[in-house]
Every structure is written in structure tokens, then in C-alpha cells.
């Protein structure tokens, strides 16, 4: 007999599958803070992938202490500029913004992305200092500097909020005041060996049919004589008189926000020429500034903004600094 039951094709966890509102991913959750206050995130632009040779330092691994080849992603990470700080208070089971203070030294390129507030640091920072003990969270408003990159063809900075974790709210406020108006390099946030999460907007695929979008089976050869093979055989019951949202249909595929957990930072450096492959990264070009090497792949195409944060489900957090022996610079052209 035919099988009566089978699991549904595709996951409903990410519905509705529509295009992301912005290319800047949203971070809704942050890792628990440590004893010392620190800025808990960063952002960079994806250049491409290559592979490295490193010493396997994972305990009890079959290749522990041996040389292994690891696929890696290269992110170009120019310093982030801290434009403002914002505090949040408890409200209705969550938090809401209670005040913000902007730097006196804003980058002129910021006016390309937003209307720059007229009120500056002075009185606002004092007002926040007076109520800081009653606040719940403190976040920094930072922006990227794509004008420093040759591989990203834009000048408009990407604006985002980055939470300050650790210590108490007063310690966080003092740290935020010291960072306001400054440029923060990635080396002051993460170090080789750090375990992080990455968020980005995936590659857009446009409108795709249900076979590619949901993974349903093709119609059998005999059933396809009606003229259709790459479609579902049933839209649902007579009642209710509408097509349910769970039915796999054609529609937008890709260009969704996705977060991948537990990526390991294998190296951080400032000499991009030492890791750029011959001929440059396809679709990106040459890395000229600071960079980070992450294990595995990250969502999105080249040139896409990638946000990083401390891992919220950290594994293997006790690993030592990675021993990277070789970074492949073989040409990626034609691959």
C-alpha cells in the first residue's frame, strides 16, 4: 500500500518567506555580560572564501595536534565609528528608549544615511548620567565606513545598535562615554579564538517554484501528462474555503535574514595583501585594510554586510589561540 503519512516538505519556522526590510541585520538577543563592561558586537563586509592549514586543537579529536585544512570566510572589517549612545528603561514587560546622546564629532558621510540630529552631546549626556541608575540597557549607535573600502561600491554608512554588556549600568555608561565619537577596531572587540555568531541577509533568488523553494517531490511521470510536473498535487480541502498558509507554493526565495551560531575567529590582521588571492576575490577585489578570518561559511554574497556578536550558545569556548600555518592565496578566478 501507499504510505499514508509523511512529514511536510520544508520548514514553516521562517514564514512568511519574504524579502528582508533592510540589508542591515537586526540583533534581538545578546550574550550574558562578563564582569567587565565591553562593547559586544562588530560588523564587516564579506570578501569571499578560501582555505587555511592549521593545527587541530580540538580536544579528543582524531586529528588533534595534526595539520588540517579548514574552509574559511574572509571579512574586511574597517573600524566602526561610534556616533551616539542610547539608554533603555523597563516598560510593559520589555524595554523602550529613554534617551540618547550624540557625539560632537560625527562623520560627514553619516548625513548620507540619516538626518543628523541637531542636539549634540553636552546637556544630553548629563541628563542621561542623572538617570543612568534607573536604566535597564545601554547600546551604542555605530556605523560602518565603506568609503575606506575598494571592494564595496558605496559610500553610505550602515547604521546599527550594539549593546554594551558586563559590569553594572554605571560601568557601561562610563565605557560608552569614552567611546563616543571614536573609531573602534575589531581587534579591541574580538581576538583569535573567540566564538561568535554571525548574521546577514542571504543571497536573493527571486521568485522560485515550490520544488526548489520547499523541496516537494516532482509529480510522477504518468501524472505529469496533464502538463505540469513541478507543482503540488493538492491545494487543500474544500473547507475552509481558502488556501492555507502552510501549503507550499511558489514565491520569494532568498534575501532573508539568517543567523549562524558558533563561528570561530581564526585570525585578525591589518595586512590584507597577505591573504588576498591572486587576482583578488571574485566580485570583491583586493583587501586593503583590517580583516577577520572566520571558520566555515557565512550567509550572503560578497560585499554583503555581516554582523558579529559574542556567541549566545558558546561551545568549545576554552580553545586556545589558533595556530594558522598557511592561508591559501591560489587564484579563485574561474572556480
UniProtKB/Swiss-Prot annotation:
Record GO terms (molecular function): rRNA binding; structural constituent of ribosome
Keywords: Ribonucleoprotein, Ribosomal protein, RNA-binding, rRNA-binding
InterPro entries documented for this protein: L3_arc_euk, Ribosomal_L3_dom_3_arc_sf, Ribosomal_uL3, Ribosomal_uL3_arc, Ribosomal_uL3_CS, Transl_B-barrel_sf
UniProt keyword annotation of Secreted present: no
Region of interest called Disordered, as start-end residue ranges on this chain: 1-20
SUPFAM superfamilies named among the record's database cross-references: Translation proteins (SSF50447)
Database matches in PROSITE patterns: RIBOSOMAL_L3
GO biological process, one term: translation
Disulfide bridge partners, by residue number: none
Family: Belongs to the universal ribosomal protein uL3 family.
Protein name: Large ribosomal subunit protein uL3
UniProt organism field: Methanothrix harundinacea (strain 6Ac) (Methanosaeta harundinacea)
Lineage: Archaea, Methanobacteriati, Methanobacteriota, Stenosarchaea group, Methanomicrobia
Gene: rpl3
Amino acid at each position: 500500500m501507499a504510505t499514508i503519512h509523511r512529514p511536510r516538505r520544508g520548514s514553516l519556522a521562517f514564514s512568511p518567506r519574504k524579502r528582508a526590510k533592510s540589508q542591515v541585520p537586526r540583533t534581538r538577543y545578546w550574550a550574558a555580560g562578563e564582569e567587565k563592561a565591553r562593547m559586544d558586537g562588530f560588523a564587516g563586509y564579506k570578501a569571499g572564501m578560501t582555505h587555511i592549514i592549521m593545527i587541530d586543537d580540538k580536544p579528543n579529536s582524531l586529528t588533534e595536534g595534526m595539520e588540517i585544512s579548514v574552509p574559511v570566510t574572509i571579512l574586511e572589517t574597517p573600524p566602526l565609528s561610534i556616533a551616539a549612545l542610547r539608554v533603555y528603561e523597563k516598560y510593559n514587560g520589555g524595554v523602550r528608549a529613554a534617551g540618547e546622546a550624540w557625539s560632537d564629532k560625527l562623520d560627514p558621510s553619516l548625513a548620507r544615511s540619516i538626518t543628523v540630529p541637531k542636539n549634540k552631546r553636552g546637556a544630553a549626556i548629563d541628563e542621561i548620567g542623572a538617570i543612568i541608575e534607573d536604566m535597564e540597557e545601554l547600546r551604542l549607535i555605530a556605523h560602518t565606513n565603506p568609503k575606506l573600502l575598494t571592494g564595496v561600491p558605496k559610500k553610505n554608512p550602515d547604521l546599527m545598535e550594539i549593546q554594551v554588556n558586563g559590569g553594572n549600568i554605571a560601568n557601561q555608561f562610563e565605557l560608552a562615554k569614552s567611546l563616543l565619537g571614536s573609531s573602534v577596531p575589531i581587534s579591541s572587540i574580538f581576538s583569535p579564538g573567540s566564538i561568535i555568531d554571525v548574521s546577514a541577509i542571504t543571497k536573493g533568488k527571486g521568485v522560485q517554484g515550490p520544488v526548489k523553494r520547499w523541496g516537494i517531490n516532482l509529480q510522477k511521470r504518468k501524472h505529469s501528462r496533464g502538463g505540469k510536473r513541478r507543482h503540488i498535487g493538492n491545494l487543500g480541502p474544500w473547507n475552509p474555503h481558502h488556501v492555507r498558509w502552510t501549503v507550499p507554493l511558489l514565491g520569494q526565495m532568498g534575501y532573508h535574514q539568517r543567523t549562524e551560531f558558533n563561528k570561530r575567529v581564526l585570525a585578525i590582521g591589518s595586512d590584507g595583501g597577505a591573504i588576498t588571492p591572486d587576482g583578488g576575490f571574485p566580485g570583491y577585489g583586493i583587501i586593503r585594510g583590517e580583516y577577520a578570518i572566520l571558520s566555515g561559511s557565512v550567509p550572503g554574497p560578497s560585499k554583503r554586510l555581516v554582523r558579529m556578536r559574542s556567541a549566545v550558545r558558546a561551545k568549545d569556548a576554552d580553545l586556545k589561540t589558533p595556530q594558522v600555518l598557511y592561508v591559501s592565496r591560489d587564484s579563485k578566478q574561474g572556480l
